């Protein structure tokens, strides 16, 4: 799990959304990923299916140019966001 302050995650996700042209839902999924939530936890939190979460995560990876969660956190960190 990645540890950082709640407000910090929200503001950094908002900045990432602008930087990478994320949808509002992708931004929400990103915030939950950064809080350490699993795919199934994200699905329950957002009232969507696991497949929908998987699609949002795939879109996050594509838009940010990464291939995994750790790399996603690094990519955002590289932009001065995390």
Q: Where are the model-predicted features located?
A:
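Basic, Lys/Arg-enriched C-terminal extension of HTH/homeodomain DNA-binding domains
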Residues: 4, 13-17, 58-82
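Short helix-to-turn junction characteristic of helix-turn-helix DNA-binding domains
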Residues: 33-37, 76
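Regulatory hinge/linker segments at domain boundaries
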Residues: 2-28
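Recognition helix of helix-turn-helix DNA-binding domains
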Residues: 36-71
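Pre-recognition alpha-helix immediately N-terminal to the DNA-recognition helix
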Residues: 27-31, 71
């Amino acid at each position: 799990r990645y540890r950082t302050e709640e407000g910090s995650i929200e503001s950094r996700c908002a900045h990432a959304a602008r930087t990478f042209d994320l949808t509002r839902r992708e931004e929400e999924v990103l915030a939950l990923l950064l809080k350490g939530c699993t795919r199934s936890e994200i699905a329950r939190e957002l009232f969507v299916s696991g497949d929908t979460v998987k699609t949002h995560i795939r879109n996050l990876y594509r838009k940010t140019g990464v291939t995994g969660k750790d790399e996603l956190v690094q990519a955002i960190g590289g932009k001065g966001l995390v």
